[in-house]
Amino acid sequence: MELSTLGLKDRAQWEAKGYQLPQFDRAAVTEATRENPCWIHFGAGNIFRAFQANVMQNILNRGEMETGLIVAEGFDYEIIEKMNRPHDDYSILVTLKADGSVEKTVVGSVVESVSYTHLTLPT
């Protein structure tokens, strides 16, 4: 199993392993976000991925928004280079429940990631 757009095409394999997958058309959300961005978040760390990105995932799954998240990182740009980009901006959220069960979710609400090392500012 590979956490990427290509790897997630085999949804049955992921679901058989107990992963909850995005329930929205990610390609359409990505296109809508690029055309009319609504939410850019500065800081791509664990708290963002576990909370804000997951909230947006739930909103997208319910069809309440058409655009996803853009995440920008200026301090720890390696998060973008080593985590986001190799996995097409997907992440995995693992939640340990009070009863000891584990919930595994592939989060796909982040559709674009940028780091300040790749921004070209006008002179």
Sequence positions of predicted segments:
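Conserved small/polar residues in nucleotide/adenosyl-binding loops
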Residues: 117-123
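Helix-enriched interaction subdomains in cytosolic or periplasmic regions
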Residues: 2-10
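An N-terminal structural lobe/cap that precedes and organizes the functional/catalytic core
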Residues: 9-116
